[in-house]
Amino acid sequence: MRTTLLLLIIAITVMVFVSEAYAAPAPEPILKQGTIESLTR
């Protein structure tokens, strides 16, 4: 029960961060692209 609640909290937090990232216009698209490239590399 406790682990399920923890996972739910994590999922909500991640969704909030993702929605904020998509809602806010990227001030530095080049920096964002570089971050994605470094993550996928």
Curated annotation (Swiss-Prot):
Signal peptide positions on this chain: 1-29
Top-rank taxon, per record: Eukaryota
Disulphide bonds in the chain: none
Keyword annotations of the record: Secreted, Signal, Toxin
Gene Ontology molecular function terms on file: toxin activity
Location of this chain's protein in the cell: Secreted
UniProt key word Signal: yes
Expression across tissues: Expressed by the venom apparatus.
GO cellular component labels: extracellular region
Family: Belongs to the caterpillar 11 family.
Function summary: Probable toxin.
Identification of the protein by name: U-megalopygitoxin(11)-Mo28
Organism: Megalopyge opercularis
